Regions:
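Pre-Walker A adenine-sensing motif
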Residues: 1-7, 292
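SF2 helicase catalytic motif II
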Residues: 126-127, 140-188, 193-194
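Pre-Walker A (Motif I) flank of P-loop NTPase domains
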Residues: 7-13, 38, 119, 301-304
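Conserved Walker A/P-loop ATP-binding site and its immediately adjacent core
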Residues: 37-62, 67-80, 125-127, 310-313
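Conserved helix/coil segment N-terminal to the catalytic DExD/H
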Residues: 103-147
Length: 342
């Protein structure tokens, strides 16, 4: 469907639920558009996603890809182990060296053009200026020599937003401008399209601001394909799930454990202790709900959980306490309850 769409249009939207294969689908669209030769750009909002896309495309490509990585973080090619709250994502090791040096990008693009074949620039939106300047240098010396056959905008909902009059565009919005980033085709893909209300659009127009909303075909093109979560479950592409909402209080903490917390024998407060008790109960499927509803499809306890914390410091603290607290909680239970707990 994208092949037919791109014969008449130069922009299109791909809406796919998480886990249904957006990255792989985009690869196949790119291969179809380039026929195994040419130049493509894959834009992502983070270094981690860049690495993920790079590895996925290099692994699944049917023809060899010459990758060029343009990343806004000069340290992206080496591992930073320490994490702090000012940088909530570890800078990962990239599968290929990254650069933000314009001359280096120009040289790599020129060499790729001379060699032929398929070249893909993997870049973060934040480094889009580097890509644009490299393109401009090459096109100035040889007009039209560096035009992307396809730009893939991953997490395209990040490219929406408002640009006020007389203010600079954000790096995420610049991708829409074909003068800034020349390309034959643009593919916008996301699981969560961001749309603005008619009221927001009217206010932006009154303020002479530019509003990028994903239902604007002039910016994003038509929606070519969509598969939501429900349809993906029906097609057995994704597993269905249930949401369990449970309430816990300090009364759910055994008295002996409460005493240890009160006396400062454990580095955890009552509130966090109650949350951990709730987590253990949920994993054990010990809740006051219909037993058949909860355990009927799968009577076994759950074995893993994801906990969200306010800061990295807190998450590290909780992670270090889980085993100790879990064991003390288990020891404080009666024998009948112990048999029900993971």
């Amino acid at each position: 469907s994208f092949h037919q769409h791109f014969q008449k249009q130069d922009r299109g939207r791909l809406i796919m639920a998480c886990g249904t294969g957006k990255t792989f689908t985009a690869l196949k669209i790119m291969e179809q558009q380039t026929k195994g030769e040419g130049l493509a750009l894959f834009l992502v909002p983070s270094i981690a996603l860049l690495n993920q896309a790079l590895i996925a495309w290099m692994t699944d490509a049917t023809v060899p890809i010459r990758p060029i990585c343009v990343c806004s973080d000069a340290k992206a090619s080496r591992k930073r182990v320490q994490l702090d709250d000012s940088n909530d994502m570890a800078v990962v090791d990239l599968a290929r060296p990254a650069t933000t040096d314009i001359e280096s990008v120009v040289q790599q693009l020129h060499q790729a053009s001379e060699a032929g074949g398929l070249t893909v620039v993997f870049a973060t939106y934040q480094s889009i200026d580097v890509v644009s300047k490299a393109q401009a240098i090459l096109n100035e010396s040889a007009p039209g020599s560096c035009v992307f056959d396809l730009i893939v905008c991953d997490e395209a909902h990040r490219t929406t937003g408002v640009t006020l009059k007389d203010s600079d565009e954000s790096a995420f919005v610049k991708v829409h401008d074909n003068d800034f980033l020349p390309a034959a085709k643009r593919l916008y893909m996301t699981a969560t399209p961001r749309l603005y209300t008619e009221d927001s659009k009217s206010k932006a127009k009154e303020a002479e601001a530019i509003l990028c909303s994903m239902d604007d075909p002039a910016i994003y093109g038509e929606e070519v394909y969509r598969i939501g979560f429900g349809e993906a479950v029906d097609k057995q592409l994704l597993s269905d799930y249930k949401v369990l909402v449970l309430t816990v209080s300090d009364r759910d903490i055994p008295p002996s454990l409460q005493k240890s917390i009160t006396n400062g024998e454990m580095e955890i407060n009552t509130d966090d202790a109650a949350k951990l008790v709730g987590c253990i109960s949920a994993l054990s499927k010990r809740m006051l709900v219909d037993e058949e509803l909860l355990k009927g499809p799968d009577p076994e306890p759950m074995r893993s959980a994801v906990a969200f914390c306010s800061t990295i410091k807190v998450s590290k603290q909780i992670a270090s306490l889980v085993e100790e607290f879990g064991q003390k909680y288990y020891d404080a239970l009666d024998e009948e309850t112990k048999a029900e707990v993971v």
